[in-house]
Design a protein with these regions (language model features):
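Amphipathic alpha-helical repeat scaffolds of TPR domains
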Residues: 2-14, 35-61, 87-103, 125-142, ...
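Internal alpha-solenoid helical repeat scaffolds
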Residues: 117-120, 125-126
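Short coil/linker segments at helix-helix boundaries
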Residues: 50-81, 101-102, 109-110
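Structural marker of alpha-solenoid helical repeat scaffolds
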Residues: 34-35, 84-85, 120
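Canonical positions in the second alpha-helix
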Residues: 31-32, 81-82, 116-117
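Short helix-adjacent coil turns
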Residues: 19-24, 105, 122
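Alpha-helical positions within canonical tetratricopeptide repeat
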Residues: 24, 37, 67-70, 74, ...
Length: 146
């Protein structure tokens, strides 16, 4: 894929994502052979699966709290496939943190990635929020154990 084509594709994916059209993102990215996708498109594909699992297209899941376990697990598998490249990338850690939080209904795994994200991007307010959220969830989990 030519660099200008890839740039246009990434812009289009961002537009679809902002319009909650996650299935469109998935269809377009998966039409590209896996060996040609590269790191960034793989992470974007994971994001689309994660968002579809939690929110659904056009937020059809609303606020019901239902998560499609198969889709969120696939999102994590995609991230795992590029772990070597992503471990030091704030965006990869963000996606892994959010996906793990939704997949496991436990903050302990997500917290590890949230902390790494915050280390890599200490001024990112979203990273700060995910760390705080995970800490709150961990406190709640601990209180339930007592």
């Amino acid at each position: 894929m030519e660099p200008t084509e890839k740039t246009k594709l990434l812009e289009q994916i961002e537009q679809w994502n902002s319009k909650d059209e996650y299935s469109r993102c998935i269809w377009v990215i998966e039409a590209i052979p896996e060996q040609e996708r590269g790191y960034l498109l793989t992470v974007k594909l994971s994001r689309a699966y994660s968002n579809l699992a939690v929110l659904g297209d056009h937020r059809e899941h609303g606020t019901d709290g239902e998560v499609d376990g198969n889709l969120i697990q696939h999102a994590i598998e995609l991230l795992e496939s590029v772990r070597f490249r992503g471990e030091n990338d704030p965006y990869w850690n963000a996606r892994m943190g959010y996906s793990c939080l939704m997949a496991y209904c436990s903050a302990s795994t997500a917290y590890k990635y949230a902390k790494r994200w915050l280390t890599l991007a200490p001024k990112d307010p979203d990273a700060q929020k995910l760390v705080r959220d995970c800490e709150g969830y961990l406190e709640e989990e601990k209180a339930l154990e007592i």
